[in-house]
């Protein structure tokens, strides 16, 4: 008799499974609704409760209805390493806060985008004061120079991203789904 589940514990498990399936469906729908060939700055909260202006920064480039490419740097204690590659799970990432659309990249320029994203992989730890945010801003400057992102002031874009991150961090901590997608007002 000790192995029999109590009815309320069964209900909790069933509700948790249903909630998990609902979240998965919402995430898949959100991914499919992203416009193709769009580039995003992606912010993740680093703590719960979230702290203001404290995010992990990365890029996401949406190429198909089922996914795209992630570009970001990870700190392994002794330095930063690239963590780029295909993903179908941008909305499934733990602590995802917000996606901020910054550009549409036409298909003929996809290779240039990928090369630019990887352009500092070999010397990332030589970027002064490198963090994921500083790497992202360094790459952003190159994306602007390449004409892939049209933004007049990358510092104001960083501030705008912080504002969006702070706005949505509490709902990220409570795992409200799907996570918001916004468009930068500073990028053309």
What are the residue ranges of the model-derived segments?
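Non-catalytic ligand/cofactor/substrate-binding and regulatory segments of enzyme domains
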Residues: 2-131
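Activation targets extended, charge/polar-rich intrinsically disordered C-terminal tails
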Residues: 119-188
